[in-house]
Amino acid sequence: MSEAKKPLLEVKDLKTWFPIRSGIFSKVTGQVKAVDGVSFSLGRKETLGLVGESGCGKTTVGRSILRLIEPTQGSVKFDGIDVLSTEGEQLRALRKRMQIIFQDPYGSLNPRMTVGSILSEGPHIHKMGNDKEIRERIQHLMDRCGLDPINHINRYPHEFSGGQRQRVGIARALSVDPEFIVCDEAVSALDVSIQAQIINLLLDLQDEFELSYLFIAHDLAVVEHISDRVAVMYLGK
């Protein structure tokens, strides 16, 4: 199979269970099966919409793929690399290629850091250039994401509207030059008019940076607008 047609992400029989504990000794008495046997693939520059009601496990799927939550069982391969068995420097390098945009833009941003510091943190960790090069990079990303790179770079998250904060979140995800982004309810907390702006921005950025998205939402109309394919989750499956 050619590289262009080979899936970027392959998820097979993914399970993420959380133990139920009770008693004085916190004995495990059962399991909450948040994700119970999910399988799908995602191509390069493709968007897969993952839709389902609240509590169905769709957010857990996204975070399990990135290993923000450790899965119980299953297989996750990214560009042929076994994500679940990767550790140390290899995992760090892999995480540079896989990013996430969170639902709550305010809760996901450090209130004590300026936008400039938030956006430059990832490039510094991954040694993507000197201070001048990184600053130029994040100023370009701010401009590309609809933020003012001169006036906004030294502001704090509380000084922005919800839509602007989500733009910061998008720029942060792009700051390390990823290939795959989990959009975890990325527009759900925004007004309808702002939702359309953010979705159009994500589509433009996908074309420009050749990104693949796992777009998680509970609103089927939103998912259909941005997605190439749609998968539906119900009770972890």
Positions of the model-derived regions?
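Hydrophobic anchor residue at the start of the ABC signature
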Residues: 170, 182, 198
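Conserved ABC ATPase signature
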Residues: 156-160, 164
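P-loop NTP-binding/switch modules centered on Walker-like glycine-rich loops
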Residues: 53, 190, 194-237
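A short, proline-enriched helix->beta-strand linker immediately N-terminal to the Walker B motif
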Residues: 175-179
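Conserved ABC transporter NBD signature motif
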Residues: 74-82
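Helix-to-loop junction immediately C-terminal to a conserved catalytic motif
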Residues: 66
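ABC ATPase NBD coupling module
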Residues: 25-29, 83-99, 125, 131
